[in-house]
From Swiss-Prot:
Any single biological process term in GO: pantothenate biosynthetic process
EC number: 2.1.2.11
Organism of this sequence: Janthinobacterium sp. (strain Marseille)
Gene Ontology molecular-function annotations: 3-methyl-2-oxobutanoate hydroxymethyltransferase activity; magnesium ion binding
Job description of the protein: Catalyzes the reversible reaction in which hydroxymethyl group from 5,10-methylenetetrahydrofolate is transferred onto alpha-ketoisovalerate to form ketopantoate.
NCBIfam families with a match to the protein in the record: panB, PRK00311.1
Catalytic residues (positions): E190
Cofactor: record remark: Binds 1 Mg(2+) ion per subunit.
Record's protein name: 3-methyl-2-oxobutanoate hydroxymethyltransferase
Amino acid sequence: MSSYLQEARTKAVTIPSLLAMKERGEKITMLTAYDASFASMMDTCGVEMILIGDSLGMVCQGHNSTLPVTIEDVAYHTACVARGSKTAFVMSDMPFGSYATKEEAFKNAVKLVQAGAQMVKIEGGAWMADTVRFLTERAIPVMVHLGLTPQFVHQFGGYKVQGKTAEAAEKMKSEALLLQEAGADMLLLEAIPASLGKELTELVKMPTIGIGAGPDCSGQVLVLHDYINVFPGKKARFVRNFMEGQTSIEGATRAYVAAVKDGSFPAPEHCF
């Protein structure tokens, strides 16, 4: 076990500390959680960031997409997670339909911040720049989600790898820079070629978190039910079962943190 995991974290994770991690080349770990007990365990295991994802619609509520999730759903689970986490950085998804206008986005983001979120995550490209600016100017930190954005599943025609053409890759790069200029603090990259994940991470100052975006992102994220192998159905390529060789979920969580920190996850078989 690495010395990182042997030492309990005493200081709260912050946006400046996450940026400092990118600058010194230390990988950031993020996992999803939906209740206080899992949040507390992840915090104890050294996970830097906990995401209350709209993935709760699929893994908790049993829907076949994230689209039915409401702002009230996310706020409820955010409050649960915030009570359990002591030092990890807590971030919440803005669910489908909750940020159609910048004013509506602010109103709903406030609900999540009041529930305990320290940052909100929104999906979308250049057209979200005004919303990002509107939120950050009003003291709400924002992570922007590019690549495979699940709320756009019907437009994509399914869950497909994005950014595979030179044109699509260049568009994503320009959008990342535009959103950073608008005030975005972090960038989540999902299901894109590993080479593009590397280029985007080098291009922007803000930390990047990857899920199926290669090993060169500033950090990685997985969904709770995926890394402990309890979500039924076909597993995405970027998922690894960290329960293998472990006797507890805590052990699996520590194994995930160690694998991200030492660069062994994601491996080539988890990348596009």
